[in-house]
Amino acid sequence: MYLQLLKSLNRVHPRAWDFIQLSRMDRPIGIYLLLWPTLTAVWIAGLGSPTLANVLIFGLGVVLMRAAGCCINDFADRKVDGHVKRTADRPLASGRVKPREALALFGILVAVSFLLVLCTNSKTVWLSFGAVALAFCYPFMKRYTYYPQVVLGAAYSWGIPMAFTAAGGELPASAWLLYIANLLWTVGYDTYYAMVDRDDDLKIGVKSTAILFGESDRMIILTLQMLSLGCLLLAGSRFELGGWFHLGLLGAALCFAWEYWSTRKLDRESCFKAFLHNHWAGLLVFMGVVLDYALR
């Protein structure tokens, strides 16, 4: 239904589908992975009763900035995507979209996102510049460091401190526990994603944590996931979250255990499924927070 709706936009403009694919709107998994931890922070910052304005601002902001990040990512990778089986048909790599068009769409999406942030307060506006900088820098990191997933984690977690400043103008130290938890989680699931392309990346000289971790990849991912849950548990104590939140963490832990088991053969398909599966862990943590506040 969702994809059919997007494809129907081709009736409005014959190239609409090219730009939908460029911004990955046809693949919402990235939206989910960014949305759940951001909304978790919005709920905690709002003490379980966030304003509708903040929910809409951060919800729409997630969609727009994730799309912007995909545009600049494909711009940065336009010369290497054609050499990777999974990405060879992307709009820029295949020539369906020009580099300047990708940059233009990136600029438009960032500008609209900034208009949303202007509806908050000055602290949140200033923090938003960090979000744009991280989104822009991430795609280029894989050329220079084996830790591009850490930069992605920093970018995907930036909405967390913004959610707190938007809610009350203050940024408590405990909010950074949520930030660190999400950064660790992101490095873990994006390493699964990088494992899908590891053989191709080795041939073309692209760096990633999947290459860095080598044969220890799955164990390191599981360790990162457990550390993430530990940070969430500590943050939950600071924010006085109880049983439902802990149940959400247990559900996430079971998700992580399944991912570790399911990738034991290290084939591309199972690694990609493990990456996709992570959004359920994020959703369970978010639902645990929502229910913990709602059922007090």
From Swiss-Prot:
<feature type="transmembrane region" description="Helical">
    <location>
        <begin position="28"/>
        <end position="48"/>
    </location>
</feature>
<feature type="transmembrane region" description="Helical">
    <location>
        <begin position="174"/>
        <end position="196"/>
    </location>
</feature>
<comment type="pathway">
    <text>Cofactor biosynthesis; ubiquinone biosynthesis.</text>
</comment>
<keyword id="KW-0831">Ubiquinone biosynthesis</keyword>
<dbReference type="InterPro" id="IPR000537">
    <property type="entry name" value="UbiA_prenyltransferase"/>
</dbReference>
<keyword id="KW-0460">Magnesium</keyword>
<feature type="transmembrane region" description="Helical">
    <location>
        <begin position="102"/>
        <end position="122"/>
    </location>
</feature>
<protein>
    <recommendedName>
        <fullName>4-hydroxybenzoate octaprenyltransferase</fullName>
        <ecNumber>2.5.1.39</ecNumber>
    </recommendedName>
</protein>
<keyword id="KW-0472">Membrane</keyword>
<comment type="similarity">
    <text>Belongs to the UbiA prenyltransferase family.</text>
</comment>
<dbReference type="GO" id="GO:0006744">
    <property type="term" value="P:ubiquinone biosynthetic process"/>
</dbReference>
<dbReference type="GO" id="GO:0008412">
    <property type="term" value="F:4-hydroxybenzoate polyprenyltransferase activity"/>
</dbReference>
<dbReference type="InterPro" id="IPR006370">
    <property type="entry name" value="HB_polyprenyltransferase-like"/>
</dbReference>
<dbReference type="GO" id="GO:0005886">
    <property type="term" value="C:plasma membrane"/>
</dbReference>
<keyword id="KW-1133">Transmembrane helix</keyword>
<keyword id="KW-0812">Transmembrane</keyword>
<feature type="transmembrane region" description="Helical">
    <location>
        <begin position="275"/>
        <end position="295"/>
    </location>
</feature>
<feature type="transmembrane region" description="Helical">
    <location>
        <begin position="52"/>
        <end position="72"/>
    </location>
</feature>
<dbReference type="InterPro" id="IPR039653">
    <property type="entry name" value="Prenyltransferase"/>
</dbReference>
<feature type="transmembrane region" description="Helical">
    <location>
        <begin position="219"/>
        <end position="239"/>
    </location>
</feature>
<feature type="transmembrane region" description="Helical">
    <location>
        <begin position="145"/>
        <end position="167"/>
    </location>
</feature>
<comment type="function">
    <text>Catalyzes the prenylation of para-hydroxybenzoate (PHB) with an all-trans polyprenyl group. Mediates the second step in the final reaction sequence of ubiquinone-8 (UQ-8) biosynthesis, which is the condensation of the polyisoprenoid side chain with PHB, generating the first membrane-bound Q intermediate 3-octaprenyl-4-hydroxybenzoate.</text>
</comment>
<feature type="transmembrane region" description="Helical">
    <location>
        <begin position="241"/>
        <end position="261"/>
    </location>
</feature>
<keyword id="KW-0997">Cell inner membrane</keyword>
<keyword id="KW-0808">Transferase</keyword>
<keyword id="KW-1003">Cell membrane</keyword>
<dbReference type="Pfam" id="PF01040">
    <property type="entry name" value="UbiA"/>
</dbReference>
<dbReference type="InterPro" id="IPR044878">
    <property type="entry name" value="UbiA_sf"/>
</dbReference>
